[in-house]
Design a protein with these regions (language model features):
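P-loop NTPase catalytic phosphate-binding loop
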Residues: 1-185, 191-193, 198-202, 211-216, ...
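Phosphate-handling catalytic cores of nucleic-acid transaction enzymes
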Residues: 246
Length: 246
């Protein structure tokens, strides 16, 4: 999966998030830092480069607003917008993962060669802290992260409450995008070093940037925004099959 981020004066003109070798992505930053913009960019990239046969989506939208525009897409396997349905969706994702491993065992192959399944969780901390969902959500997300890679199952988790994400969960996310954080400690929790707290504030400075964490350290990128009319065009294309034929 390729995310086209511009690196101002940096060494990269394009950010390539390798979801094959680093299958899970954690996006973290304070309120208004650009998490929704980042997720929209990822989903836009997937919708523009893959078909529903190649990419399946499970969307967990506890705010009931950030991901609702996508729920009618043919790519979407399941959409959940509260705690109980979120747990059902995570459990279904795990069952799909286990079924894929059973299929690989029957066919004597080591890597699943079917569609990619992306489990996108908006405000993952809510699931991991609420008493009604905490224990089961932690168990399911951790298990998905541990075994998802070989089955082409990917978890994309977003949060503004970085310290509340257990270390046992965080350590499974090798792919990380750090947006502006409240303080240096939050920056260290997401990208192992301070710096994200000093990123421009998109609300007051009208400029959004992020750090993408690489094996050699964090790299600074501009955060692109998919225009509303462009996203509407892509959503319209996939939700009106007749227009695809035309």
């Amino acid at each position: 999966m390729t995310l086209t981020y511009t690196a101002p004066g940096g060494e990269y003109s394009r950010l390539y998030a390798d979801m094959a070798t680093r299958p899970h992505l954690l996006i973290a930053g304070k309120t208004g830092s650009g998490k929704t913009t980042t997720v929209n960019g990822i989903l836009h990239a997937l919708l523009c480069s893959t078909t529903p046969a190649e990419t399946r989506l499970i969307l967990i939208d506890l705010k009931m607003i950030e991901l609702q525009d996508y729920k009618r897409l043919p790519h979407v396997h399941r959409y959940a917008d509260d705690g109980p349905t979120a747990l059902e969706a995570l459990n279904e994702a795990l069952n799909i993962t286990l079924a894929r491993y059973a299929d690989m065992q029957r066919r004597h192959v080591k890597r699943y060669d079917g569609s990619h399944l992306f489990v996108v969780i908006d405000e993952m901390a809510d699931l991991l802290t609420a008493k009604a969902t905490r224990d089961k959500a932690t168990e399911l997300i951790q298990r998905l992260c541990q075994i998802g890679r070989g089955a082409r199952v990917h978890v994309i988790g977003c949060t503004q409450h970085i310290p509340t994400i257990p270390t046992s969960i965080r350590c499974n996310f090798d792919n990380r995008v750090a947006l502006r954080t409240v303080n240096a400690n939050d920056s260290k929790n997401i990208m192992y070093s301070p710096g994200a707290e000093a990123l421009p504030d998109p609300v007051t400075q009208h400029k959004a940037m992020c750090y993408y964490v690489t094996s050699s350290g964090p790299v600074l990128y501009d955060l692109p925004m998919v225009p509303d009319d462009e996203m509407a065009r892509v959503l319209d294309y996939w939700t009106h099959p007749a227009r695809q034929i035309a």
